[in-house]
Amino acid sequence: MEKFTTHTGVGVPLQRSNVDTDQIIPAVYLKRVTRTGFEDGLFSNWRQNDPNFVLNTETYKNGSVLIAGPDFGTGSSREHAVWALMDYGFRAVFSSRFADIFRGNSGKAGLLTGIMEQSDIELLWKLMEQTPGLELTVNLEKQIVTAGDVVISFEVDPYIRWRLMEGLDDAGLTLRKLDEIEDYEAKRPAFKPRTNA
């Protein structure tokens, strides 16, 4: 997993609340068994049926910092929703509230989910409306987002923050213990099952 310390990208104002995982990526796209190729499914119902949807505009189609309304990622637990956001190019999503499971899935995959006050979300929406294509800089170490002269703090679970800054997914966490695993396996009797030949 790629380390996350700072990221600068175009902010995308998703001025909708209660965006559930079925809206993020409909179930029809969940048939793949790989973790890539989901960008076409991201918000597909809105992108296909609303020509004015934010991701259909030239200004925001390459955005990488999503500023969403409250209760983002609710509904069923779909890692595919996180994968779709990341495949599209998003590195961070900010909202005043996230579903716990979505937030956990995001942290494990490398997508930052930062919690801001709703008034700060609305301030960012206003700034992006005034300056379409506004670049936002996310500093995970300091837990701030900078938009021009405006600096806004955000919250993130300390454990997820550490994992993102270290670039550690579940496999990476396990590999940190590789010496201990190999030592344990070397001491196991030969008649017991082994993980290596």
Swiss-Prot record:
NCBIfam families: leuD (TIGR00171), PRK01641.1 (NF002458). SUPFAM superfamilies: LeuD/IlvD-like. GO terms for molecular function: 3-isopropylmalate dehydratase activity. Belongs to the LeuD family. LeuD type 1 subfamily. This is 3-isopropylmalate dehydratase small subunit. Heterodimer of LeuC and LeuD. The lineage of its organism: Bacteria, Bacillati, Actinomycetota, Actinomycetes, Mycobacteriales. The gene is leuD. It catalyses: (2R,3S)-3-isopropylmalate = (2S)-2-isopropylmalate. Catalyzes the isomerization between 2-isopropylmalate and 3-isopropylmalate, via the formation of 2-isopropylmaleate. GO terms for cellular component: 3-isopropylmalate dehydratase complex. It comes from the Bacteria. PANTHER family: 3-ISOPROPYLMALATE DEHYDRATASE SMALL SUBUNIT (PTHR43345:SF5), 3-ISOPROPYLMALATE DEHYDRATASE SMALL SUBUNIT 2-RELATED-RELATED (PTHR43345). Keywords: Amino-acid biosynthesis, Branched-chain amino acid biosynthesis, Leucine biosynthesis, Lyase.
